[in-house]
Amino acid sequence: MGGKDYEFGGPIGTGVLMLILPPISHYLHFLITPRGAPPPEFWSAPLETLKSVTPTFSSLFSLHATLAVAAYYLLLVALMYVLPAEIAEGVVLKDGSRLKYRCNAFTTFLVFFTFLGTMTVLEGPTWWFWSYLTDNFAQLQSASIVFSYAMSLWVYIRSYRPMPKGKEVILSPVGFKGNHIHDFWMGRELNPRIGEWLDIKQLHELRPGLMGWILFNLAWTVKQYNTHGFVSDSIVLVNLFETWYVVDALWNESKVLTTMDITTDGLGVMLLFGNAVWVPFMYCLQARYLASFPVHLGLLGIAGVLAVQFTGYAIFRGANNQKNAFRTNPADPAVSHLKFMTTKSGSKLLISGWWGVARHVNYFGDWIMAWSYCLTTGFNTPLTYFYVIYFGILLLHRDRRDEAKCREKYGKDWDRYCKVVKWRIIPGIY
């Protein structure tokens, strides 16, 4: 059993998160009203305003929305199996094995959205599909919340299953602490699978959340057009930036197999709720706001937001590509000139290029891109800036987890490395 070095504040912290995240995810959307986002009276009477925008509990659920969410997941599973796929291997597990993964998230995206685009061209912007998503947004979100917690419970109970002699369930080092609340949040089993190929964590890591994010962005864009008769430059930029981000992730699906989500974290509420609810329903907050309150940026505004986006992406993708190229082949001409430090374990840590600037410089680029999404909404509401604040906190927390993991892995070599690469995320500041 793992030690009691709990994550996320231990049983109390994870328990609180599991209680408050679902209502937070709902209320940020409830507060976008026809009179403002939030309505003017919120600042003088927040509790009364929250009460007034709260729908009845029963109205948050519907059978058709639940069936729609189920159909969405079944479709993604079917496309994962049916479409051509790159077969990639994961990292070596503690039993010496390496799992194989079907990587075709990008192809799935192309097939899925090509179909939706074709239907929209044929049926026009009044096609029922788009209005269904926006009119039943809260019900779809509630169904996804229930699904994520139910799936979390199933994989948690399943992690205790007996195994044939000589085999064992491979558990997550951070989700195997012996406390049910904490382990339920973190995820006890590392790589739960159904059959040989259906890796439940891989399925959720990119597909339902990221594709759902773009799906709702487009739905709110159609809503803006049907309501106001135009599509604003701001919502076009939101769609371009966020679709770009998603496509980049889907295209690089095999590279996700070496990230902490896959190699270290178990599959629990944190990843399942995050990918089934938080990403698709919270990350579309900018498009949701702009559907009701269009913002016209003009040429100068567009240029400014584009500059922020391109700067962030150059750092984010440049750093990640450099790291992946070095890991794959240090002799590659693109990275062979980079300086590195060799640890006692034989690992090589980059100390020049992007990775000589900061130890997690890719997080800095990611956060800059988050600013570009929020800036498209102007400065008339704080709600749409929730994303950049939350994302900054997330990256700081992930940085601390990464640092602890690396210090445990490399020991004194990590201290030596930190003296060379002094900054953690933002050079000169942090």
From Swiss-Prot:
It catalyses: 4,4-dimethyl-5alpha-cholesta-8,24-dien-3beta-ol + NADP(+) = 4,4-dimethyl-5alpha-cholesta-8,14,24-trien-3beta-ol + NADPH + H(+). GO terms for biological process: ergosterol biosynthetic process. The gene is ERG3. This is Delta(14)-sterol reductase. Belongs to the ERG4/ERG24 family. Gene3D superfamilies: 1.20.120.1630. The chain crosses the membrane at residues 12-32, 67-87, 109-129, 230-250, 267-287, 290-310, 349-369, 376-396. It is an enzyme of class 1 (oxidoreductase). Reduces the C14=C15 double bond of 4,4-dimethyl-cholesta-8,14,24-trienol to produce 4,4-dimethyl-cholesta-8,24-dienol.
